[in-house]
Amino acid sequence: MNIIAGRLRETAECSQRINQAEGLVRDEEDVMSAITEQGMSRRNFLAGMAGVAGLAAAGLAGCSSAGGSKEASGSDASGLPEKWDGEYDVIVCGGGGSGLTAAYSALENGAEKVLVLEKAAACGGTTALAEGAVQASGTQWQKEIAGVTDDSAELHKKFWLTDAEGIVKEDLVECMAKNAPDNLKWMADSFNITFSNVFGCYPTPYMKDEYMRDRIHLITDASDETKTGGVVWTTNAQKAVEEKGGEIQTNTEVTDIYQDETGTVVGVAAGKKNYKANKGVVFAMASIDHNEEMAFRYDQQQYWDLKTQFVATAETNTGDGIRIGMAHGADSAFHGAVDLILQTWSYTNNQNPEIPYILIDQRGNRFVREDTTYAFHCRAMFNAAMAQGGIDGCTYMLMDSKMTTADAKCAWSDNAKDGAKAREAALADGSMVQADTLEGLAEKLGMSGTNLKATVDAWNAACAAGEDAAYGRKVQLTALDTAPYYAWKTQNTNIGSIGGLIIDTDARILDVDGNPIPHLYGGGVNTAGWLGPYYPGSGTCLQGALNWGRIAGASAAASK
């Protein structure tokens, strides 16, 4: 059924369904009889009811008449604008790494007129805030810089699939792994980029050693190797898009899409204007990072991060593309979050020195192998906190005096800039406590001194034996045996949520029945199906932004 046409009829139908969902129509047989007469199957009815309930809960406008921006230009009987304020081949919604890549790819693949609409005052998004790490196997840089000559897309795929814990679509992961080497070469050629370093991530407890390689490439400006990071990508990509004739509008929020009588996406509503897209619309508007309502309903870890931790992504990441897509029947999936311990950069890559510590819960017990890729042990921290304290639960990083002389990446080390001041500030605000004995530390934390001492004794014995029999840790088997002792109430830094609209290998956004929504494409973390319940290591999201943005732009340009 056409989603847009006949707004009055749509509003009436949505109102009726909501009334039914609220129990105002009590006789299920009467309800099913009525919808059967309208040609709807029970399966589609139930799917629609679930969608209506979810969208209503998330504050979506799927059951309203056309939004304010649509009404501004007037609509005809089909629900389409009476006139368009601009006409393009491809419209890209979102000007971060994936969106700019999609725009360039569309132009490169034959689209003559491409428009990028960015909600913020400038392009870049969270990509511009990122370290600039991109994963790939078998590249010239991996061979030349890291000396890795035995990697392959197959090993890379198996690495990603293992960390996904079975909660991804294998064809999407395979697509990313196979395309990754060429994507990096294309990125370098298209955006004046090189890669100045290649390093690796840490494993998870169930990862096979044979799947591990140094694959993380650091984005660097080919004209100035002092410039690194995601901002190099977005800056250079924006320039490349504009040089190819692409148009970019900032301070422009996309609020809806238009579909014709066949369900084909034909344009977007943005601000008070409506723009026609003859070939396709690409959603690259990130995930639900700062949308508390959607996180509450779909992503428990992201909600916890918003309420109690620190979310460091672009504030414009409010799931706009996901909300709009769901309102038009798109399928979705939500899993977890991308968290790290920024104060120590713990286990973010295998070139960083690590400080001696263990993680403990509110009872003083270890609960995870600490030397795992950062989002894995951060997920365990979330689970441990929730298990013992709910939304107000917490975990602790337990250290001894060696922390004060650790590497400068530790925020409280004397070797860090203002490290001693940072340590004193943490002690003053109570986020860190210090004591000369473990029993004294436990008392300050409100936990059993006997239990905490037993935990540390067991850890120290494992260090002496050279084997962590409890969890299998291999890095920094260093005893905590020198007073004073410190416990820091951990605070995760969130650099993104995991969840979005389901796509296929052509970056087409799928509806709840698994069918592509015609002329609607997705890139980056606006999409889902290629990331599992936690982040499998630096460079995965940027490869996802690159891969799906590149494919989405090309697919849209090729649309008929």
Mark where each language-model region is.
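Conserved redox-cofactor binding core of oxidoreductases
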Residues: 176-272, 292-293, 463-482
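N-terminal Rossmann-like FAD-binding beta1-loop-alpha1 element of flavoenzymes
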Residues: 90-115
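An anion/pyrophosphate-binding glycine-rich loop and adjacent beta-alpha core
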Residues: 322-324, 328-447
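Glycine-rich loop(s) and the adjacent beta-strand/alpha-helix scaffold that form part
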Residues: 276-343, 551
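A glycine-rich dinucleotide-binding beta-alpha-beta segment and adjacent secondary-structure elements
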Residues: 451-530, 534
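Glycine-rich FAD pyrophosphate-binding loop
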Residues: 109-127
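N-terminal secretory signal peptides
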Residues: 1-41, 51-58
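Core beta-strand elements of the Rossmann-like FAD/NAD(P) dinucleotide-binding domain
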Residues: 86-88, 271-280
